[in-house]
Curated annotation (Swiss-Prot):
PANTHER family: UPF0102 PROTEIN YRAN. This is UPF0102 protein ERGA_CDS_00540. Pfam families: UPF0102 (PF02021). GO terms for molecular function: nucleic acid binding. Belongs to the UPF0102 family. It comes from the Bacteria. InterPro entries: Restrct_endonuc-II-like (IPR011335), tRNA_endonuc-like_dom_sf (IPR011856), UPF0102_YraN-like (IPR003509).
C-alpha cells in the first residue's frame, strides 16, 4: 500500500508536469519550436529546450499552487548549464545558435512570471 508521502510526491510531480505543458503551449503560441521536453543526460535534466530565430533557449519551469517565486539554486543552474553543453555537443546543428537560459514561474494564485536570461554562463577572463 502506498505511503502518504508517495501520494504527495505524485501530486508535486503531476503539478510540475502540468506547469511544463502549459509553458510549452505558451511557447508554441509565440512560435517557438520545442526540441525537447524533460531532456535528461548523465549531467542533469532540462525541463524544456526550444528555439526561435537562431536562438536556443534552455528553460527551467517552477510550478506552485500558491508561491509566486520558487528559487533556483546555483547548483541547479550549474547542472542545467552542464546539461546544455552536453546537448549542444551531441546536436551540432545548434552550435552556432545564441544561447539563453530562461526561468518560468507558474502559480495558480499569481499566474505566469517569465524571467528571460535568468542566468548566464560565467565568463572566464584570462590575464
Amino acid at each position: 500500500m502506498p505511503y502518504k508521502k508517495d501520494y504527495k510526491r505524485l501530486a508535486y510531480n503531476t503539478l510540475g508536469y502540468l506547469g511544463e505543458v502549459l509553458i510549452i503551449l505558451f511557447l508554441k503560441c509565440k512560435l517557438y519550436h520545442i526540441i525537447k521536453h524533460r531532456y535528461r543526460c548523465p549531467l542533469g535534466e532540462i525541463d524544456i529546450i526550444a528555439h526561435k530565430n537562431k536562438q536556443l533557449v534552455f528553460i527551467e519551469v517552477k510550478t506552485s499552487l500558491f508561491n509566486k517565486n520558487i528559487p533556483i539554486t546555483y547548483k541547479q543552474q550549474k547542472s542545467i548549464l552542464k546539461s546544455a553543453k552536453y546537448f549542444i555537443a551531441f546536436h551540432r546543428k545548434f552550435a552556432n545558435y545564441s544561447i539563453r537560459f530562461d526561468l518560468y514561474f507558474f502559480s495558480l494564485s499569481t499566474g505566469l512570471t517569465h524571467i528571460p536570461n535568468a542566468w548566464q554562463e560565467p565568463q572566464v577572463v584570462y590575464k
